[in-house]
Regions:
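N-terminal assembly/interaction segments in proteins that build large macromolecular machines
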Residues: 2-252, 256, 260
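ATP-hydrolysis module of ASCE/P-loop NTPase motor domains
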Residues: 264
Length: 264
């Protein structure tokens, strides 16, 4: 059977595979469109296996919020190059996979059982793993899901920084109005910028607090214009015992564990 340009174009639109791959698939299957799709799928699996040993060091983070606004999910999917990480086909795929993760009952983690479970989640008539294999073949680079996380509360927000280099999700219990969302969004931005280890001072052990104070004072003493050490210690004690939250803030929300994914 003669393979026409329109057939190749149709198969390419159906699968996203390259023109030459589509032409080869149609030739191998004597123009049978369904068989050609299956051929490309199997060929994609073979290509993905060949790329399995490559290093996927680039990538992007994407986040999503559930329809009721109470659950947030953030995911990191890696590619081999920054060029692909910025590709709209790739980023749209990441967003779709994150939506599947959000809709599932999985909680997330890094390189753990939930990653394997996510790969088995139904996705566009197949599974996430099948889609990952197909995208690897279509895009031409190794793609891998590195991690995803969820948080839930009475209200949840997300923040993506640097075009997807950093993704943050934060949930809280309490009010769920616009003021609460604005406060949480500001917190998410601070988490993205500062990467805090603790939510509040009460979460820090006395030993760790003393160590942090010592490091801060010693660093300040390197400045010739610095105040004497006893005065610095008193100033830091005062700062540590103060509250960055007003009574109104504290009554508004109780922050759950924030999650920050940063591509390294």
């Amino acid at each position: 059977m003669a393979i026409t340009a329109s057939m190749v174009k149709e198969l390419r639109e159906m699968t996203g595979a390259g023109m030459m791959d589509c032409k080869k698939a149609l030739n191998e299957t004597n123009g049978d469109m369904d068989a050609a799709v299956e051929f490309l799928r199997k060929n994609g699996q073979a290509k993905a296996e060949k790329k399995a040993s490559r290093i996927a060091a680039e990538g992007v983070a994407r986040a999503a919020i559930s329809a009721d606004g109470k659950t947030a999910c953030v995911i990191e999917v890696n590619s081999e190059t920054d060029f692909v990480a910025k590709n709209e086909t790739f980023t749209s795929f990441v967003e779709a996979v994150n939506a599947a993760a959000l809709a599932s009952d999985l909680q997330g983690g890094k390189d753990g059982e939930d990653i394997e479970a996510l790969l088995a989640v139904p996705f566009e008539g197949a599974t996430v793993k099948d889609a990952l294999v197909e995208k690897t073949a279509t895009i031409g680079e190794k793609l891998s899901i590195r991690r995803f996380e969820k948080v839930a509360g009475d209200v949840a927000v997300s923040y993506i920084h640097g075009g997807g280099r950093i993704g943050v999700i934060v949930a809280a219990n309490g009010a769920s109005d616009d003021a609460a969302r604005e406060a949480l969004t500001n917190i998410a931005m601070q988490v993205a910028a500062m990467n805090p280890t603790y939510i509040s001072r009460n979460d820090i052990s006395a030993e760790e607090l003393a160590k942090l104070q010592e490091i801060t004072v010693d660093a300040a003493l390197n400045d010739p214009a610095s105040l004497p050490k006893p005065i610095l210690n008193k100033l830091i004690d005062k700062a540590m015992n103060s509250s960055a939250w007003s009574d109104e803030d504290l009554s508004l929300i109780h922050i759950s564990e924030p999650t920050r994914l940063a591509l390294i």
